[in-house]
Structure formats: structure tokens, C-alpha cells
């Protein structure tokens, strides 16, 4: 089964939020698994029965096609590959916005806090090569069309670095600046250096795919455990217990 429980939030995902004729729904790969899982659930309520049906839930079908950046239509969805060209910005509400370049076209991207992948988005830097997927939101009076992201796949990370004062190996200390354009000098042994050194910084994100927490999944969002699975087909068996009345 999949998407039955969000362990990060300790939240049950089997049951509807509002009053509903459906008491719970188990998502799984085949009818045998669903029947077995259903027997493990022991509700206090008296249920009328169950029905097993096939759907496109958890298939990622809406993100199988590549978006045409020259025909960036609202309410369409798909994937894009591009390079980050604008440093991510974080709003007061915790949402993250950044831009990528795809075939010389700038695409604005949004990652919303409920997805729980904002921590990934805000760590992106200019030069990161990504594959992203989501739906295009229509333009408003205050915002242009934007791609609302449902996943971020980091294909190649750009190296992150900063300039630091030169390090004196003799004294095991960083040198001090002698003044603007005057270089650096060790205060102990007086060794000098003309330039700062570049220090590379370990990135907190990795070259992998990031998807929202389970509780933030949309109907079609493909869970991690299904990412590498090939499409399965189970033919209907009229003798199986696909429909049962208690």
C-alpha cells in the first residue's frame, strides 16, 4: 500500500476530513494487497461493505509530458529542465520563488510551504541544473504566469564557494588585511599574501528528486516508492472479491 500514513506529521491519511459515505480508502498496487490491508483495519463503526476500483491515483500521469515554454498556457502541467538564474526568495508565509532558464525563456517557479519542499527550494543557487514538474498558474494583476512545483529533481549542483582571508600554515591562523588593495599579512610571522582564498562550501541538498510530504500529495502525485516502478496492469477477475457486502 502507499500514502496511508504520514509518519512525519503522525497523521492518518486513510479517512476523509469531512462527513462522507466513504469511511476509509486504502491505496495499493493490486487487489490482493488491498483486501489483506482492509482486513487489518478494525473499525468500531458497522460498515456496509467495500469496493475495489482502478484509478490513476499516484501515477504522475499529469507530469509525463514536457511543457512547451513557447506556449506556456495556464492550467496545463508537465515537466521542464532548466538552470536556476535567480536566487530563491522566501515570503513571509514561507513560500519560495525562483526562476530558471529553459531554451532562453525565463520561467518563474513557486514552491508553497504546505508541500514541505521549501527547505530544498530555498537552498538552490544560481547555476543549479534542475528538472521540475507542476502546473501553470494563470497570471494575476500582481503576478505573472508561474509554474507551481510538485517536485524538484536536482540533476547537477553548482559549486558553492566564498572568499576568505588567506591561511598561514606556519601559524595555523588566518591572515589579516593590511588595507584596501594592500594584501594580507600574518600578525605573528609576518608572512604575506596578495589575494583571498576561495573556500568551497558543502551543499545541504543533493542530486536527487524531492517530492512533497505524503499529506501534501495531490491525487496524481507519484509516491517515492513508485518512482522506479513500471506501469502494472491487473485484469479484472469476476471471481475475485472486488465488491463485497458485509
Q: What do these predicted ranges mean?
A:
Residues 1-246:
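OB-fold and OB-like single-stranded nucleic-acid-recognition modules
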Amino acid at each position: 500500500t502507499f500514502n496511508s500514513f504520514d509518519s512525519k506529521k503522525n497523521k492518518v491519511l486513510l479517512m476523509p476530513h469531512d462527513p462522507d459515505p466513504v469511511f476509509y480508502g486504502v491505496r495499493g498496487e493490486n487487489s490482493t494487497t488491498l483486501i489483506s490491508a482492509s482486513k487489518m483495519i478494525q473499525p468500531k463503526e458497522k460498515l456496509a461493505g467495500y469496493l475495489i476500483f482502478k484509478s490513476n491515483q499516484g501515477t504522475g500521469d499529469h507530469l509525463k509530458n514536457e511543457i512547451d515554454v513557447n506556449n506556456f498556457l495556464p492550467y496545463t502541467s508537465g515537466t521542464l529542465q532548466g538552470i536556476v538564474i535567480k536566487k530563491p526568495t522566501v515570503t513571509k508565509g514561507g513560500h519560495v520563488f525562483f526562476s530558471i532558464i529553459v531554451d532562453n525563456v525565463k520561467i518563474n517557479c513557486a514552491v508553497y510551504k504546505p508541500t514541505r519542499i521549501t527547505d530544498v527550494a530555498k537552498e538552490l543557487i544560481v547555476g543549479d541544473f534542475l528538472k521540475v514538474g507542476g502546473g501553470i498558474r494563470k497570471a494575476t494583476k500582481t503576478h505573472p504566469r508561474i509554474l507551481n512545483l510538485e517536485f524538484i529533481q536536482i540533476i547537477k549542483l553548482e559549486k558553492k564557494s566564498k572568499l576568505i582571508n588567506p591561511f598561514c600554515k606556519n601559524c595555523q591562523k588566518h591572515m589579516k588585511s593590511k588595507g584596501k588593495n594592500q594584501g594580507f599579512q600574518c600578525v605573528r610571522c609576518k608572512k604575506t599574501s596578495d589575494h583571498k582564498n576561495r573556500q568551497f562550501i558543502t551543499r545541504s541538498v543533493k542530486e536527487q528528486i524531492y517530492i512533497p510530504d505524503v499529506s501534501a500529495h495531490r491525487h496524481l502525485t507519484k509516491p517515492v516508492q513508485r518512482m522506479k516502478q513500471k506501469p502494472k496492469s491487473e485484469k479484472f477477475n469476476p471471481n475475485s472479491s472486488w465488491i463485497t457486502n458485509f
